[in-house]
Amino acid sequence: MGHKIHPTGLRLGITQEHRSRWYATSKMYPILLQEDDRIRRFIHKKYGAAGISDVLIARKADQLEVELKTARPGVLVGRQGSGIEELRTGIQKTIGDHSRQVRINVVEVERVDADAFLLAEYIAQQLEKRVAFRRTIRMAVQRAQRAGVLGLKIQVGGRLNGAEIARTEWTREGRVPLHTLRAEIDYATKVASTTYGVLGIKVWIFKGEVLGDEAQTMPVGASPRRRGNRRPQQFEDRSNEG
């Protein structure tokens, strides 16, 4: 009998990168891993309105680097960068080390509706507002298709529309090749808290296939070409340097 494997874990080192990039001894590894978890929980809880899709953490000696991928960078940066300093102080307080150097880099998400986590968050918000789940899924599919994704799958499970018996409903549009390792699959989960209980949301988005050693993403059926020079807008914090 077949079982579904986590799409991100299956592709680590192929089309996906690790969200925590550091090395540690066997004694320090669990401590630093728990630190990463606390940092992510703190950021998602306090800055939920900023539409943060991913938090990448890297460690170099005594320096901690945090990269935030967000749909609304202005909410994080704040006026004249005041939000960055507040975020840095909050991270230092979370890990219990105010002397640790924390460097923060905010990256704007190019296509919001093509991001699996942000799409799952949108679905959760609509379900919590008591919008019918089928209408919510249909609207989410339309938004993703307008963003130019090649395929997506959405699954919602729980007491849908307040039904007595929990069930799972899903829909798929386009191609979602979960067995193809070179396929770039963006996967995310989210929980919606409703008056009838919690609903589990899963989103798979197929963005293209990665070709060659340069990890170049190419839509299926298109001729290979290099990406343009345009880069997503970045807000890099260098106040701790020098």
Curated annotation (Swiss-Prot):
**Taxonomically, which superkingdom?**
Bacteria
What are the record's GO terms for cellular component?
cytosolic small ribosomal subunit
Keyword set, alphabetical order? Ribonucleoprotein, Ribosomal protein, RNA-binding, rRNA-binding
Q: Name one GO molecular function term.
A: mRNA binding
- The Basic and acidic residues compositionally biased stretches are 233-242
> Is rRNA-binding included in the keywords of this UniProt record?
yes
InterPro entries documented for this protein: KH_dom, KH_dom-like_a/b, KH_dom_type_2, KH_sf_prok-type, Ribosomal_S3_C_sf, Ribosomal_uS3_bac-typ, Ribosomal_uS3_C, Ribosomal_uS3_CS
The UniProt record lists the keyword Mitochondrion:
no
Region Disordered: start-end pairs:
217-242
The record's Pfam families line, in alphabetical order, gives: KH_2 (PF07650), Ribosomal_S3_C (PF00189)
**GO annotation, biological process:** translation
Annotated KH type-2 domain ranges read 39-110
- PROSITE patterns annotated for this entry? KH_TYPE_2, RIBOSOMAL_S3
Q: Which family does it belong to?
A: Belongs to the universal ribosomal protein uS3 family.
Q: How does it assemble?
A: Part of the 30S ribosomal subunit. Forms a tight complex with proteins S10 and S14.
What is the role of this chain? Binds the lower part of the 30S subunit head. Binds mRNA in the 70S ribosome, positioning it for translation.
Q: What is this protein called?
A: Small ribosomal subunit protein uS3
Q: Which organism is it from?
A: Prochlorococcus marinus (strain MIT 9313)
* Organism lineage string: Bacteria, Bacillati, Cyanobacteriota, Cyanophyceae, Synechococcales
Give the gene symbol: rpsC
